[in-house]
């Protein structure tokens, strides 16, 4: 039995969000041991329980207040919301923040030998999908009628099996479509992972834990997006060098004991530092340039 006093977080047991969700929680300092066959894991150092379930079960667990938080793809969440609204419900939840992983798109794909002249080609066609409400929402806005073929997996085989004329499925790289003789023709929805919270007030202890977790998640994401830069730079070129570093804060500048014409610069850059940028820094006289990953950040 899960104790009500413990914060309950639902995440995907296996699939495209599972590994990165687990890594995010671990980087936030939550010590958990996940066993392959167990659906429930307990944090060792915080009053947190992790429920590992199918991704399409997570929105319902949050909306029905079975868990407090959920890490879920926006596409799965939106499909559940549309499903419940179609049934006359008014689902409520709180979006805590968008996360920096789980990027994908929901797209319509056709067999490679079929012509595509825009969405009107789908009029009265049979489309296989695991997201019937998102597909209907998109095509209804365009005034296009279609027949839905609901599949919960292996959607890409539907045209070859004679089940459908087209498919609407998640796409990351397009390799699966290509392997099944399909081509992507229309993006209908773009998605990332989100952290959501159930509707209603949490207990004071749970809310304090969520607040702490949000600060840590912010620090983890900022650290992943940032680099720590150190270099020796000529004093007369400081402004030029700083202008080459997009997203960089004003640097810490320290004198270099062995050379009064150079200073030591330390700074955090919130954007990717490419080789070309480092070469341009060197051309301006910078030396001993180091670009380091950041483990944690807190502002």
From Swiss-Prot:
PROSITE patterns: ATP_P_PHORIBOSYLTR. It catalyses: 1-(5-phospho-beta-D-ribosyl)-ATP + diphosphate = 5-phospho-alpha-D-ribose 1-diphosphate + ATP. Disulfide bonds: none annotated. Keywords: Amino-acid biosynthesis, ATP-binding, Cytoplasm, Glycosyltransferase, Histidine biosynthesis, Magnesium, Metal-binding, Nucleotide-binding, Transferase. Catalyzes the condensation of ATP and 5-phosphoribose 1-diphosphate to form N'-(5'-phosphoribosyl)-ATP (PR-ATP). Has a crucial role in the pathway because the rate of histidine biosynthesis seems to be controlled primarily by regulation of HisG enzymatic activity. GO terms for cellular component: cytoplasm. InterPro entries: ATP-PRT_HisG_long, ATP_PRibTrfase_cat, ATP_PRibTrfase_CS, ATP_PRibTrfase_HisG, HisG_C, N-reg_PII-like_a/b, N-reg_PII/ATP_PRibTrfase_C. It comes from Baumannia cicadellinicola subsp. Homalodisca coagulata. Its EC number is 2.4.2.17. Coiled coil: none annotated. Feedback inhibited by histidine. This is ATP phosphoribosyltransferase.
